[in-house]
Amino acid sequence: MALRKEVHIFCIAKRVAVNGVNSNTSGRMRQKMAKILCVCISKERKTCSQNIHECEADLQGLVGDVHYGMGGRKQVSLLPYEKVKEYFEQSEEEFRCGRFGENLLVEGIDWNSIAEGNRFRCGDVLLEAVRIGAGGPASDAYKGEKVCTPMEPWFVFCQILEAGRLREGEIILQQR
C-alpha cells in the first residue's frame, strides 16, 4: 500500500489541504486554490487597466480605480489567465495584463464551476461573486469601440466583503 503524501499550507490559521478540502470542515466546504497574476486598475473609463502589482481593497472598491466609490456590488473584476493566454496565442497582439479592463488576472480556478455567491479569500480580502459574465455589447477597453469582447463570458464581478491588500502572487481560496 503506497503512502499518500499531503502537502498543507496555512491560511488564516486554518489548515487547508492542497487537494481542496478544508480539514476543519470535514469536507463540507470545498475550496479551490488559485493565484493572482496581475492586480490592475484604470484611472479613466473605457481604457485598458494598468498593472500596479498590489492595491488596497476596501468596502468601496479598489483604491485608485475609476470605479472606486461608485456604489453597487461590481467592485472587482476577475478574469482567467488561461482564457486571456488563449486569446493572445491566437491574435497578433502582445500579451499584457489589463488588456480587457480586468482588475485581477487569476490563474488556476475552474471558471466553469463558479456561481454567484461563491467567495474568494485573497489574504485578508474576501470577495463574493455577484455576476458572471459582462453581458451584452461592452466597450472594448483596448480600442474604445462598442464591440463584444471575447472575454465577456469569462468576467466574474465581485463585491468586497472584507477589506485588505491584494497582491500579485497571492493565493486565492475559492469557497462554494
Question: What are these model-predicted stretches?
Answer:
Residues 8-12, 16-176:
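Metal-cofactor-dependent catalytic cores
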